Amino acid sequence: FIHGAGGSSSIWYKQVKEFKAHFNVLLIDLRGHGKSQEIFERYFSNEYNFENISLDVIEVLDHLKIKQSHFVGISLGTILIRTICELAPDRVKSLVMGGAVTRLNIRSKMLVVLGNATKKFIPYMWLYKLFAWIIMPRKRNQESRILFANQAKKLCQKEFVRWFGLTYKMNPLLRYFNENDTQLPTLYIMGDEDYMFLPQVMQLVRNHANSSLQIVPDCGHVCNVEQPDYFNNTAINFITSHS
């Protein structure tokens, strides 16, 4: 399980029990997040980019002697597992992409420009809460907003700036991912109210032969939190069918 920016492995708390009944489960805290925060300065001095952070994940698999995995990601975590497909496709059995970020629309591009212009001057929690509200504006998205805000509070401003800097590197990478199918079984699980990212995923799935899409009713961006039963059943059935 690969979480998004500002989160931690704890965002999968509604998945762990269900998935452990079927699979061996590995939860990873990305550099600077969760329990990886304490060792950050000692081990993660290389540049922040999607390739290096994805290599962190592969290093964990190597350490645990895991040759192949089914990967489940949420939000920015989906970009990382898609990057792993490029770096080490033989390590990937299938992908479950929740709240996937596959292309930026005009609104999200404006947010990226605004955030990068102000990230060193405005307290990062102001920015984080603003972005969370824009991406997840509805009342039923409140649990997701609160969960991510509580996790983001554990980051320091310096760490937030490093991660936000990744947004500048997203466009060419996402363009490449859109133009190149992985040829691996890929399931996208998207909330029907994920207005910033769902249209782009719908277009991508039409062009990628091995991709499929499940749209979760009454649900926003963080579908594993807002509709966990739907997410769990759909993902488990998909992974089982490709095991």
Description of each model-found segment:
Residues 4-14, 25:
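Serine-hydrolase catalytic-loop signature spanning alpha/beta hydrolases and amidase-signature enzymes
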Residues 86-87, 92-122:
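Flexible "cap/lid" loop of the alpha/beta hydrolase fold
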Residues 73-77, 81:
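Gly/Ala-rich beta-loop-alpha elbow adjacent to hydrolase catalytic centers
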Residues 225-237:
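Post-His helix in hydrolase/transferase enzymes
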Residues 2-4, 190:
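The conserved beta1-alpha1 loop
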Residues 106-108, 125-180:
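Conserved alpha/beta-hydrolase catalytic His-Asp/Glu region
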Residues 185-219, 225:
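Conserved loop-alpha-helix segment in the C-terminal half of the alpha/beta-hydrolase fold
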Residues 14-17, 26-72, 233:
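Active-site loop/oxyanion-hole signature of alpha/beta-hydrolase fold enzymes
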